[in-house]
A protein has these predicted regions:
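Core SAM-dependent methyltransferase catalytic element
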Residues: 140-160
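Conserved class I S-adenosyl-L-methionine
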Residues: 17-25
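Conserved SAM/SAH-binding beta-strand->alpha-helix loop
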Residues: 46
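A short glycine-rich, Lys/Arg-flanked "PGG" loop and its adjoining helix->strand segment in the class I
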Residues: 86-98
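Conserved SAM-binding strand-loop segment of SAM-dependent methyltransferases
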Residues: 52-63
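Conserved beta-strand signature within the Rossmann-like core of class I S-adenosyl-L-methionine
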Residues: 97-105
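A short acidic, Gly/Pro-enriched loop at the edge of an enzyme's catalytic core
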Residues: 66-74
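Conserved alpha-helix/loop element of class I SAM-dependent methyltransferases that forms part
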Residues: 1-17
Length: 160
């Protein structure tokens, strides 16, 4: 399975460093990052073995994995929403580090769901950061067709 197109587009512009892939699933993004020089840690509650990647079996909802503070150059969270993780993601990035988050978006005519963000909600979690990409609606690229909110944001070099 191919990596998320937004991840490829974003990571190609960055100097490889330490990457954290939260709720990595099959590991497609972790594999791509590792193949392109990143030192990757992947976390998921389902067992996954990925060559050249430090994998952790952990349930993020139960806080079984602690995100190290100021340790990561890139943190990826694709198609997984746990609102209370955003603070840890922001603290986990080094100054100048990049967060890439793709989550399902609430669509008109659909019932409210705790697994989807409201329009504008994702951007609020990264207020004060440099937003390199923000999109709401059908994915900017990729294989699924559900409405999403996507953000790529850089942590400020100084505290705000």
């Amino acid at each position: 399975m191919a990596p998320t197109p937004l991840l490829v587009e974003t990571a190609r512009k960055l100097e490889p460093g330490r990457a954290l892939d939260l709720a990595c699933g099959s590991g497609r993004n972790s594999i791509w990052l590792a193949e392109h020089g990143w030192t990757v840690t992947a976390v998921d509650r389902s067992p996954v073995t990925i060559p050249s990647v430090d994998t952790h079996l952990a349930d993020l909802e139960k806080h079984e994995f602690v995100i190290e503070e100021s340790a990561w150059d890139l943190i990826v969270m694709c198609l997984y929403l746990q609102r209370d993780l955003f603070g840890a993601v922001k603290r986990g990035l080094k100054p100048g580090g990049v967060a890439l988050v793709i989550v399902l978006l609430m669509e008109p005519g659909h019932e409210s769901s705790p697994f989807r963000v409201q329009p504008g909600e994702l951007a609020k979690y990264f207020e004060g950061w440099e937003v390199l990409h923000y999109h709401e609606g059908k994915p900017s690229a990729g294989e699924h067709h559900r409405a999403v909110a996507e953000i790529v944001a850089t942590k400020p070099l100084t505290k705000r």
